[in-house]
């Protein structure tokens, strides 16, 4: 029976483990991210039935499988991975902030909200996750903008460099941070839900005494945490996608809250959860996969640094 190994490791090990976990999850789940973006950018049409039918016939996606099938048939299998270069490049800093940043903020909030023996509480878990999410947003926003513009079905861009050049020429370097405010909302809410729920679920599950039991708990907690995170942040993810797709001085979608209200008024409440199914299908199991890979890579690094635990 293998006991759980919690020996501490320096930041560089956490950084590397987070990057490996993030890229592993990305390679497996990325097609669902493309589907999510396509569905979020799809505007619900209102008006005369004939007009609605005509517009719906043009690349209208009715669900996850319908979208996957149409992308493969019309554009080719490779388009399920369109825009993946940008998220791969941002995975290392993104995951480093998500995990090590969360740990750093936990230490900070434990000083503000002292607990007996420095124990964790759900409040600290939520605050730490939200704070790490806010910092994370500043890192990922430009990469997200590039990814969204490449994933768009109407995109004329072929490479990330084309997107960057076009954005900088038209709007300057700061235009790469278009949608930053919406990205902050998205990451704050998701991380708060994810880490807050993981903390609570781990308390409810039977205490893990072996590495196998820890993997089981991580899968369950990560999947539930990922689902809750999606429920909280999808409306802001929808408007983020639309804000980042647009360019130029006159844009329909600008700030998050007015954009959420605009989507609600024009398309109804359901439109705020467009792409929810592929998002949950990715981030629920993906959240579990992320924790499992991260934990196992960290255990491997501990063996390399300290030797096998007796």
From Swiss-Prot:
GO cellular component: mitochondrial inner membrane; mitochondrion
Family matches, as SUPFAM superfamilies: Mitochondrial carrier (SSF103506)
Superkingdom of origin organism: Eukaryota
Any GO BP: malate-aspartate shuttle
Gene3D superfamilies documented for this protein: Mitochondrial carrier domain
One Pfam family this sequence matches: Mito_carr
Membrane topology: Multi-pass membrane protein
Solcar repeats: 9-108, 120-204, 213-300
Record's subcellular location: Mitochondrion inner membrane
Keywords, sorted A to Z: Membrane, Mitochondrion, Mitochondrion inner membrane, Repeat, Transmembrane, Transmembrane helix, Transport
Molecular function in Gene Ontology: ATP:ADP antiporter activity; dicarboxylic acid transmembrane transporter activity; L-aspartate transmembrane transporter activity; L-glutamate transmembrane transporter activity
Family named by the database record: Belongs to the mitochondrial carrier (TC 2.A.29) family.
UniProt xrefs under PANTHER family: MITOCHONDRIAL 2-OXODICARBOXYLATE CARRIER
Protein role: Transports C5-C7 oxodicarboxylates across the inner membranes of mitochondria. Can transport 2-oxoadipate, 2-oxoglutarate, adipate, glutarate, 2-oxopimelate, oxaloacetate, citrate and malate. The main physiological role is probably to supply 2-oxoadipate and 2-oxoglutarate from the mitochondrial matrix to the cytosol where they are used in the biosynthesis of lysine and glutamate, respectively, and in lysine catabolism.
Protein name: Mitochondrial 2-oxodicarboxylate carrier 1
Species this protein is from: Saccharomyces cerevisiae (strain ATCC 204508 / S288c) (Baker's yeast)
Gene: ODC1
């Amino acid at each position: 029976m293998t006991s759980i190994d919690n020996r501490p490791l320096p930041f560089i090990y956490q950084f590397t483990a987070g990057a490996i976990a993030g890229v592993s999850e990305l390679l497996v789940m990325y097609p669902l991210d493309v589907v999510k973006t396509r569905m979020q950018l799809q505007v619900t049409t209102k008006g005369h039935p004939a007009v609605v039918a005509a517009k719906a016939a043009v690349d209208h996606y009715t669900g996850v499988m319908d979208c996957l099938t149409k992308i493969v048939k019309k554009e080719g299998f490779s388009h399920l991975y369109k825009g993946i270069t940008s998220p791969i490049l941002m995975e290392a800093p993104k995951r480093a902030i998500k995990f090590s940043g969360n740990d750093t903020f936990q230490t900070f909030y434990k000083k503000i909200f002292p607990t007996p023996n420095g124990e964790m509480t759900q409040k600290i878990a939520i605050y730490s996750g939200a704070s790490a999410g806010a910092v994370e947003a500043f890192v990922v926003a430009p990469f997200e903008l590039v990814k969204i513009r490449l994933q768009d079905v109407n995109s004329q861009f072929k490479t990330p460099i084309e997107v960057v050049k076009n954005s900088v020429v038209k709007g300057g370097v700061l235009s790469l941070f278009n949608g930053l405010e919406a990205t902050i909302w998205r990451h704050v809410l998701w991380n708060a839900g994810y880490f807050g729920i993981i903390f609570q679920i781990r308390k409810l599950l039977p205490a893990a005494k072996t590495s196998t039991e820890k993997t089981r708990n991580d899968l369950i907690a990560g999947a539930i945490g990922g689902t809750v995170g999606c429920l909280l942040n999808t409306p802001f993810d929808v408007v983020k996608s639309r804000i980042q797709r647009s360019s130029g001085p006159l844009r329909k979608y600008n700030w998050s809250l007015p954009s959420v209200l605009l989507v609600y008024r024009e398309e109804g409440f359901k439109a705020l959860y467009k792409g929810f199914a592929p998002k949950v299908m990715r981030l629920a199991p993906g959240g579990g996969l992320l924790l499992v890979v991260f934990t196992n890579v960290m255990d491997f690094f501990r063996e390399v640094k300290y030797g096998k635990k007796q």
